[in-house]
């Protein structure tokens, strides 16, 4: 884990209205976002394989998010 950079996550929290963000808060959110993204990606891969494809397409990602 820990592949997402902290700075963009910090900016996301600030976009949500925070004036200041602790490094630990940004790290925790980054970890959660990474875990969520991996789960979405795994589902998308399953959908692509079920469709007989090796390539994950936008529709696979959208379907994975909805499921």
UniProtKB/Swiss-Prot annotation:
InterPro entries: Archaeal_histone_HMF, CBFA_NFYB_domain, Histone-fold, HmfB-like. Signal peptide: none annotated. GO terms for molecular function: DNA binding; protein heterodimerization activity. The keyword Cytoplasm applies. Coiled coil: none annotated. It is found in: Cytoplasm; Chromosome. Keywords: Chromosome, Cytoplasm, DNA-binding. Residues 20-22, 54-57 are annotated as: Interaction with DNA. It holds the Pfam family CBFD_NFYB_HMF. The keyword Hydrolase does not apply. GO terms for cellular component: chromosome; cytoplasm. Homodimer or heterodimer with another histone. Dimers then assemble into higher oligomers, with the DNA wrapped around the protein core. PANTHER family: ARCHAEAL HISTONE A. Belongs to the archaeal histone HMF family. NCBIfam families: archaea_histone. Binds and compact DNA (95 to 150 base pairs) to form nucleosome-like structures that contain positive DNA supercoils. Increases the resistance of DNA to thermal denaturation (in vitro). This is Archaeal histone A. It comes from Pyrococcus furiosus (strain ATCC 43587 / DSM 3638 / JCM 8422 / Vc1). The lineage of its organism: Archaea, Methanobacteriati, Methanobacteriota, Thermococci, Thermococcales.
